[in-house]
């Protein structure tokens, strides 16, 4: 009787569900381990083979930790708000709730068929009002703390679609859907003040066990730089332009200023004769994405405003230009151009015949900008100074003139938090007719997303919620004042910022989570997910966590202690899997043909967990063959337990068994599952060669296999005569003294020629080695009739006899 995966997998999945095998108790006194997966967006396409890779890794660790006596929290949920469901609703007129519900059912079925040990009683869904009640509650805390504010922000407005698009939905200035023109236009938006936490987000990275590459991505995104704020007065205007620069020492080389086309001063300072050209340029640049505008390969463009600024240290007039390579979202949206020492400024100055003044010696500015170090020249009081000294001196001079100060700048922008969408958490704010605004009282949360059979763009740039009068219009019962609810909704990031906290106490209707439980479970011990979330999701979650820490809601400064990014599973030809290429592998098909255990084993055996590796049907077949070999070793054709498994130890497998326990334990700790599986294969090969298999070794092997292939693990454990699930059985231990052979083979040489090979106990003394060598029949023949001049014994290696 062969290994019937369909029967066995169904049997144990039912057993786990019926017995709630993986239900996590809040035993606050027990040592804990919190293993977290990045929860999925439940798309219409269902699970693909990339999902189970990370999920299998956390599941192996969770099962391993349970066997080590840990209280393990291993939950799963759904990041279910988001654009695809909204798009489906717009295209079909159907409510996204039903679409989302069906997708979740599919995902859940697929995940359960893979045998993951989740505690389904802790399942969360970001679209559940009992969940987003607390997302809204967190928003109110941010608002009360002054961290949520309304600002005019340029957005991607598509008149034809009557809606605002995300950057991802705009390709080359037109909408991805339909190819309609898209314009940048300012709109009132909710923004979160993440910049207030920039330094802490940067500094606390050092305390985390994260891949260095991810930490660097976050550091670069935050982009802390030290420099100066310089203020340039505008000629004949009661206004000035603030610039942030990391090189205030080059101020003597400034020959013009450049503003972003959206800068608030552009319209005010532009002269009459330049107005038309400036307006046209502003309109043209509104059709470009930030990426296009900052593309270094593209030809620089710009327009002179007709206005001039004054250099605060030289008193010279500097023409003010606008150019789209300067973004309003970075720094102050204004640049002091030093073309002699900046490549972009050099290119711009060369194109528009603007002066190029050298202020740092060492280059040839007739040919190109010099960006190296050198002595300052043509720089007044800075002449002769090196870079560092000159920067300090320049700031000193600016401060003395009241024209600047030392400043730290961040590339990080405040987080644009509102979306002009229906399918998201309603923002709990009311705008009153007297111009004030208030948050919805906490006791009235959740503010429910209204159900509607007509989800269509408002046409005004507001979300479709603006069409629903009974939602929008409110009256204050106490004062009779009229108000309008906020119609923007939260971004998909909101629900995923804090979901790991709700798993800790998912049914608490009085608070986000019980403080004692938070204290027990935080921080997350292991977080596994794709590298595509390296910056935004992790940064936003860390930001919210720090705010909640400051409010006394959570007890730790950081949410995720250890982070690991699994690699990507590619198609057979090393290409990314995609529907268009027709190379997507559906896990349902594999579970049906090979079994869930085979899929889990194969994805862990493909290579290192963080590597990008191509899918291979041969590799999949090989993994199945290994499980078949294991089955045949343990189970006879008639289904009975193999009589090779015995209660007496003949010591033949001592060494390989103990080596296997040691190797698998170490590899599970370091997430090197591929090499752990290799060692399990070595053990099985030796078992096939052995006369008998000591039953405790057979059981130990099954315990090590079970976290990777849990269904066959449970079945073999059961067939070995055990009554309980293998889930909470103690993890095997190894005996150091058995990691090496108890006997060694030594050679015996007579006059340099090998005459015998002996197996002797490892701890045999030199004297005993000599005696054993001299007793050997071959040795006796070789030294017969000769005088023994010398005997040299090297423990565990050889005995050399010199005889004449």
From Swiss-Prot:
Matches recorded under Gene3D superfamilies: 3.10.20.590, HUPs (3.40.50.620), Isoleucyl-tRNA Synthetase, Domain 1 (1.10.730.10)
EC number in record: 6.1.1.4
Reaction catalysed by this enzyme: tRNA(Leu) + L-leucine + ATP = L-leucyl-tRNA(Leu) + AMP + diphosphate
Binding-site list for ATP: 579
Motif ('KMSKS' region): 576-580
UniProt main location, coarse: cytoplasm
GO cellular component, one term: cytosol
Pfam short name (any one): tRNA-synt_1_2
One biological process term in Gene Ontology: leucyl-tRNA aminoacylation
Keywords: Aminoacyl-tRNA synthetase, ATP-binding, Cytoplasm, Ligase, Nucleotide-binding, Protein biosynthesis
InterPro entries hit by this protein: aa-tRNA-synth_I_CS, aa-tRNA-synth_Ia, Leu-tRNA-ligase, Leu_tRNA-synth_edit, M/V/L/I-tRNA-synth_anticd-bd, Methionyl/Leucyl_tRNA_Synth, Rossmann-like_a/b/a_fold, tRNAsynth_Ia_anticodon-bd
Compartment(s): Cytoplasm
GO molecular function: aminoacyl-tRNA deacylase activity; ATP binding; leucine-tRNA ligase activity
Motif ('HIGH' region): 40-51
Entry's family note: Belongs to the class-I aminoacyl-tRNA synthetase family.
NCBIfam families, per the entry: leuS_bact
Name of the protein in question: Leucine--tRNA ligase
Protein source organism: Staphylococcus haemolyticus (strain JCSC1435)
């Amino acid at each position: 009787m062969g290994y019937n995966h369909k029967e066995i997998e169904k049997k144990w999945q039912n057993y786990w569900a019926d017995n709630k095998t993986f239900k996590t108790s809040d035993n606050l006194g027990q040592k804990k381990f919190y293993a977290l997966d990045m929860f999925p967006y439940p798309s219409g396409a269902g699970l693909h083979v990339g999902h189970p890779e990370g999920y299998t890794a956390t599941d192996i660790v969770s099962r391993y930790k349970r066997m080590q006596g840990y209280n393990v929290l291993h939950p799963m949920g759904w990041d279910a708000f988001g654009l695809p469901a909204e798009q489906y609703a717009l295209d079909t007129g159907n409510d996204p709730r039903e679409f989302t519900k069906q997708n979740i059912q599919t995902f859940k079925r697929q995940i359960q068929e893979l045998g993951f040990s989740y505690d389904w009683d802790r399942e969360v869904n970001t679209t559940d009002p009992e969940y987003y009640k607390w997302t809204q509650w967190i928003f109110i805390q941010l608002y009360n703390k002054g961290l949520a504010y309304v600002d005019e922000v340029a957005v991607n407005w598509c008149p034809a679609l009557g809606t605002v698009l995300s950057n991802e939905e705009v390709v080359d200035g037109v909408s991805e859907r339909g190819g309609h023109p898209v314009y940048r236009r300012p709109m009132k938006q909710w923004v979160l003040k993440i910049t207030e936490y920039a330094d802490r987000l940067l500094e606390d990275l050092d305390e985390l066990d994260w891949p260095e590459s991810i930490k660097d991505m976050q550091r670069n995104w935050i982009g802390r730089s030290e420099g100066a704020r310089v203020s340039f007065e505008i000629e004949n205007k009661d206004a000035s332009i603030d610039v942030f620069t990391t090189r205030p020492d080059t101020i003597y080389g400034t020959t013009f200023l450049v503003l972003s086309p959206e800068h608030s001063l552009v319209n005010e300072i532009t002269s009459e004769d330049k107005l038309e050209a400036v307006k046209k340029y502003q309109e043209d640049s509104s059709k470009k994405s930030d990426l296009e505008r900052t593309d270094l390969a593209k030809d620089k463009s710009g327009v002179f405003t007709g206005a001039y600024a004054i250099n605060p240290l030289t008193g010279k007039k500097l023409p003010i230009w606008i150019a789209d390579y300067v973004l309003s979202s970075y720094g102050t949206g204004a640049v002091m151009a030093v073309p002699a020492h900046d490549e972009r400024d050099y290119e711009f100055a060369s194109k528009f015949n603007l002066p190029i003044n050298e202020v740092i010696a060492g280059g040839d500015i007739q040919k190109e900008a010099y960006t190296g170090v050198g002595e300052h020249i043509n720089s007044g009081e800075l002449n002769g100074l090196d870079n560092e000294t000159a920067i300090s001196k320049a700031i000193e001079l600016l401060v003395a003139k009241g024209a600047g100060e030392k400043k730290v700048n961040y590339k990080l922008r405040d987080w644009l938090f509102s979306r002009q969408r229906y399918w998201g958490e309603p923002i709990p704010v009311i705008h009153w007719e007297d111009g004030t605004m208030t948050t919805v009282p906490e006791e009235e949360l959740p503010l429910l997303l209204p159900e509607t059979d007509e989800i269509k763009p408002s046409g005004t740039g507001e979300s479709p919620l603006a069409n629903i009068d009974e939602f929008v219009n409110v009256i204050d019962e106490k004062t009779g004042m009229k108000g309008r609810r906020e119609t923007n909704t939260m971004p998909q990031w909101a629900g995923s910022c804090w979901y790991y906290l709700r798993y800790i106490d998912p049914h608490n209707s009085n608070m986000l989570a019980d403080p004692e439980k938070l204290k027990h479970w935080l921080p997350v011990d292991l977080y596994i997910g794709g590298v595509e979330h390296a910056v935004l999701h992790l940064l936003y979650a860390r930001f919210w966590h720090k705010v909640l820490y400051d409010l006394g809601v959570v007890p730790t400064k950081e949410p995720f202690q250890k982070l690991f990014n699994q690699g990507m599973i590619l198609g057979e030809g090393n290409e990314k899997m995609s529907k268009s290429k027709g190379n997507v592998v559906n896990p349902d098909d594999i579970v049906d043909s090979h079994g869930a255990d085979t899929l889990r084993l194969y994805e862990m055996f493909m290579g290192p967990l963080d590597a990008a590796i191509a899918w291979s049907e041969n590799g999949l077949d090989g993994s199945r063959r290994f499980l078949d070999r294991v089955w045949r070793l343990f189970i006879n054709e008639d289904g009975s337990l193999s009589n090779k498994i015995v209660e007496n130890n003949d010591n033949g497998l001592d060494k390989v068994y103990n080596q296997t326990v040691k190797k698998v334990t170490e590899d599970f700790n370091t997430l090197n599952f591929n090499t752990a599986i290799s060692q399990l294969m070595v053990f099985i090969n030796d078992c096939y060669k052995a006369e008998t298999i000591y039953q405790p070794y057979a059981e130990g092997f099954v315990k090590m296999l079970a976290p990777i292939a849990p269904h066959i693990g449970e079945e073999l454990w059961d067939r070995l005569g055990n009554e309980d699930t293998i889930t909470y059985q103690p993890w095997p231990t190894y005996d150091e003294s058995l990691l090496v052979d108890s006997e060694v083979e030594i050679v015996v040489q007579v006059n340099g020629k090998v005459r015998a090979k002996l197996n002797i106990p490892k701890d045999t003394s030199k004297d005993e080695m000599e005696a054993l060598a001299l007793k050997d029949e071959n040795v006796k023949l070789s030294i017969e009739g000769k005088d023994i001049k010398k005997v040299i014994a090297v423990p565990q290696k050889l005995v050399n006899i010199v005889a004449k």
